[in-house]
Amino acid sequence: MKLTYRPEIDGLRAIAVLTVIFYHAKINFFKGGFIGVDIFIVISGYVITKLFFFNNYSLSNFIEKRIRRLFPGLLLMILTTTLFSYFFLLPIHFMNLGQSLMANMFSISNFLFFYQTNYWDSAVLTKPLLHTWSISLEIQFYIFISIIFALFRNYFFKIILFFFFISIFLILFFDNTVFEINFREFNLNNYFLIFARLWEFLLGSIIAFALNIKKLDNYLKKLNFFHNFGLLVILISLFIVQTPLNYPNLSTFIPVLGSAIIILSSNNQNSHFLLNNSFLIHIGKISYSLYLWHFPIFIFFFYFFDFNLSFLNKVYALLITYFISLISYKFVELPFYKKKLLQKKSFFLLIILVYVFILILGVLISSQILKSKLHFNYVKIKNDFPNYNFFQIPKRIVLDNQFTNSDKIKILVCGDSHGFDLVYALQSNSEIKNKYEIELSSFGSCLNETSLKIDKSDYVLSSIQIEGSRYNKFEDIEKLYKIVKTKYNKKFIIVGVTPEFKTDSDLLFNYLVQNNISKEDLINNIPSINRYFHNNLKFNITNINKKLFLISKNLNVIFLNKFDYICNEEVKFCYGIDQEGKKLFFDYSHYTNDGAIFFGKKIYETDWLKLNLK
């Protein structure tokens, strides 16, 4: 059976790539732009299965076609990104890029990012090749389908294979569903894994088999509404599927179902007018190039503009993405795929040489033999600011005492490392210590009622970071409230999370290196540095604080927001450095010793605690 061109598939590809690009550009028409990847996966499962089993492709022919389709554009994008990264990425981010290069050459970048990062974390803005995880995922599916193809070649086996795919699809779908419901806190990075996505590929494969059944194909052609219903399902999913940490989950089935319905509705031209327009078909044809180039372009834009892009800058980035993608499609992707550039032997020789070159680059970069241009600034800044102790955790002493019999208001902070920061800041200020006794217990010991300090306290403060901690459920705070109020009858206070900044390293150090700030220029740059800290705030922290505030209102307890003494929203700054040039954070959100002293003073000056009644 010949694989006839279906323009509505290109229209569907266009919707997929546009939603992904808008999502990465943080153009918030909708919250579920990441579902574009799910649409791509279903399309890929359908197209590859159709090519393999119903077009008499040989295995070698299939492999050559896929390599010609994927690798010329991919390798060019990787080389270009590496060149720009050399000039603009910070040393630590450039070193991480080396690992990405090696992982891409083995088509396992999805596994690398599974271990390295959370897809929803802001640290992804320092990884210009993060989007290649889905290309590795697709190549892994190619390997899977190639093995199946080698085993099931004749018509009889195709019938067996059809039911085999259905069985595997159902098993994987229900397995992922059960896992998501029962173990969702352990599901954070499954987004990257083939095991969590294979059922989506297989649904596309099942459609390819189903459309080979003439009666079903003819019946579906009569259902004019079927295609439009699938498109409606996808559009609805863009608004109702949000960004949970444990995606893919049950909601993934919505866009997958919509994509399946559209593909199933076959080549009924009367029902495809929405996807058959020339604009969407054009975007669909260059969708692979758009996907390849958009992410590194936006990463570098975010990098240049302190992770805070204006709408106009986003438009510029979109235009650059389009024109580079168009050039890449016309002069790289299409000529190589149509065999207009290089015959088989020459083509594979070129691919192997570039592969080896990128692999060597990855080894040199990840081992820091080849260092970024900013490395020289890195060395200079380290020498100019020897007392900053970049990347070193400060030594502290917080005495784990029991409360005394004094008349001071007694405050117990139940917290994690950020709760420790709060206690250290409070204890570092003499005026606060004259009025309050402040002690610390781990959140776990308070929650499990193993702390002996609750009974002797006047106030119990819950101070944990929520996201990224093992106490990542808001319900745990409500559980602690019930313990404190019901069993001990103490006053309970919820403390908001500490501002976190978009970096996996020292943010002040990043600023000094990127701008090559000398020791003499530091004081003059303090306002710019503090604005830089505000520009690099993680967006999700505000949402977490809003949720904590609502919980405090429902429980009728006090809510204290750390933003009140760390940041100022009116003038758009967060303290990252004080007026004497002392650094206040040693990583993405933890105080230095100087920071604890500084914030202790701010807590006192703003009367942040406001606890006057014993």
Each language-model region and where it sits:
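Membrane-interface helix/loop caps of multi-pass membrane proteins
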Residues: 1-342, 355-360, 613
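Extracellular/periplasmic envelope-modification machinery, especially enzymes
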Residues: 218, 243, 305-315, 319-326, ...
